[in-house]
């Protein structure tokens, strides 16, 4: 599948801009890896060494070329310092659907960065003509992420039983969705 091009202007909202992952984001990756949950959800090892974090950065840099989607650093607009990671994943683009995910480094949580990042990611995602809907899948216990989804304009849907393997176990997830506005 051929993906849409990278945005010429970085998606931005509030205090955050989304930019491609760069080598300088190794420190951000290492900080993310200290959250015990983050390594369970992707390819970043827990308490990653510099070499492991560098390898993760390289993998993220290849996601677009592999046809998976867009892997962004969440960076503060005022100094371009990366405070997290988010992705718009397009494996179901042929059906008009995308999925998104986001994570903020533990030391920068509670500043509204996740909501700003999700808003920027959503606006970008819905600007892609083929994307009609973006879904988030969040574990029911993850109250901060549930609130971020709601602040980002996503509507709570159903509990999807056994939706995703996390840490080697199928987990129930709450589906949140947002749709492209219908033009009259």
Predicted regions and their residues:
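Acyl-donor (CoA/ACP) binding surface of acyl/acetyltransferases
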Residues: 1-36, 71, 75-184
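Short loop/turn motifs at secondary-structure junctions and domain boundaries
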Residues: 62-67, 154
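Hydrophobic residues in alpha-helical segments
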Residues: 33, 42, 64-65
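A generic secondary-structure signal
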Residues: 59-63, 124
């Amino acid at each position: 599948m051929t993906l849409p091009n990278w945005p010429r202007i970085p998606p931005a909202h509030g205090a955050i801009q989304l930019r491609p992952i760069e080598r300088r984001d190794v420190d951000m990756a290492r900080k993310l890896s200290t959250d015990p949950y983050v390594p369970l959800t992707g390819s970043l090892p827990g308490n990653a060494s510099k070499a492991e974090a560098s390898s993760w950065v390289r993998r993220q840099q290849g996601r677009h070329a592999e046809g998976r989607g867009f892997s962004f650093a969440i960076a503060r607009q005022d100094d371009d310092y990366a405070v997290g990671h988010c992705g718009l994943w397009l494996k179901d683009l042929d059906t008009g659907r995308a999925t998104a995910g986001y994570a903020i480094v533990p030391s920068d949580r509670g500043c509204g960065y996740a909501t700003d990042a999700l808003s920027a990611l959503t606006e970008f995602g819905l600007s892609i003509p083929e994307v009609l809907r973006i879904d988030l899948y969040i574990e029911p216990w993850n109250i901060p992420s549930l609130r971020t989804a709601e602040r980002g304009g996503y509507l709570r849907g159903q509990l999807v039983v056994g939706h995703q393997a996390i840490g080697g176990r199928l987990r129930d997830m709450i589906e949140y969705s947002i749709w492209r506005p219908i033009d009259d």
